[in-house]
Amino acid sequence: MRKIIHIDMDCYFAAVEMRDFPEYRGKPLAVGGSSDRRGVISTCSYEARKFGVRSAMATAYAFKLCPDLILVPGRMQVYKDVSLQIREIFSRYTQLVEPLSLDEAYLDVSECQQYKGSATLIAQAIRRDILAETGLTASAGIAPVKFLAKVASDLNKPNGQYVITPETLPEFVKTLSLRKIPGVGKVTAEKLSSLGLNTCGDVQAYSKPELLARFGKFGGVLIERSQGIDERGISADRERKSVGVETTLAKDIYSLEQCQQVMPGLIQELALRLSRSAKERKIHKQVVKLKFNDFKQTTIEHRSDEVSIVMFYDLLAQAMARQEGRGIRLLGISVGLADSILAVSEIPNAQTQLDLAL
């Protein structure tokens, strides 16, 4: 049986700010963009969360919930540097580390001999090292499988940990909400609920052939996860799946022509990001995303192994057909990256294609 730890830093960006600027401690603090420029909250302190402030919330709305909110701009390089410190700590215990973002990661400690191989004690040691060396707290989840380790890391926050053992796993998953399963979003959850399926226990008792008939391949995944089965390993060499860029607009715009004026800057920035992080990766799709002023969003994608600037504009026009009179507050473009890395001589890479097009 594997021993998986999910480490999740507590309100990471905000915690770094409170560490470096003690005057923010104990106060409602948020890191994000300004309210007069359509900014959003990246993360916030637990004091701010008591007022209902949350990540990805519009900054203007956050101030309505918490008028005394302290808003600071992000210092991304600082957060990256601290994240590297944390990853160095991980490497003392295992090389099987799968970073999910700057502030969370999966670790497989199945072969770790420290602390007599106890994943519980290893997680405690990692959290202790992080606190001693960075001044920041982390929470941890320990389980035999990945998705349950992630669920567990959220159960004793902040600065705590929760263990799901092979013995307690069957009872734990029975009462687990299906919303906790990766891939079950709001729409899928509503479909499942209409069938009387709200917990993993409900799925366990439901007809498997009917689930497969209704949900196809995902039905099979749902059946496995509801039994606590997750065979996915730790991707220590995990490659990014996409590169994108988006902009939140200072004011809502309403016409296709206005959106088209935003595109050249996005395309240039995308080319720059590709040159930095995916120089020789082959693409497999292009995507355009719009977020409307009612905070709903739509995405249009086109599968292709070549970047086409014209296609980005075509996808934009298709997305605008879903506007229904709403204002546009965010516009983004991205490319999906294929798993294989081919030599430049075999196929023009995405960044080169964009340079040629520009």
From Swiss-Prot:
SUPFAM superfamilies: DNA/RNA polymerases, Lesion bypass DNA polymerase (Y-family), little finger domain. Mg(2+) binds at residues 8, 103. GO terms for biological process: DNA-templated DNA replication; error-prone translesion synthesis; SOS response. The record marks 13 as: Substrate discrimination. Its EC number is 2.7.7.7. Binds 2 magnesium ions per subunit. One of its GO terms (cellular component) is cytosol. The active site is at 104. It catalyses: DNA(n) + a 2'-deoxyribonucleoside 5'-triphosphate = DNA(n+1) + diphosphate. Pfam families: IMS, IMS_C, IMS_HHH_1. GO terms for molecular function: damaged DNA binding; DNA-directed DNA polymerase activity; magnesium ion binding. Residues 4-185 form the UmuC domain. It comes from the Bacteria. It is found in: Cytoplasm. Keywords: Cytoplasm, DNA damage, DNA repair, DNA replication, DNA-binding, DNA-directed DNA polymerase, Magnesium, Metal-binding, Mutator protein, Nucleotidyltransferase, Transferase. Its cofactor is Mg(2+). Belongs to the DNA polymerase type-Y family. Monomer. Poorly processive, error-prone DNA polymerase involved in untargeted mutagenesis. Copies undamaged DNA at stalled replication forks, which arise in vivo from mismatched or misaligned primer ends. These misaligned primers can be extended by PolIV. Exhibits no 3'-5' exonuclease (proofreading) activity. May be involved in translesional synthesis, in conjunction with the beta clamp from PolIII. This is DNA polymerase IV. It comes from Shewanella baltica (strain OS155 / ATCC BAA-1091).
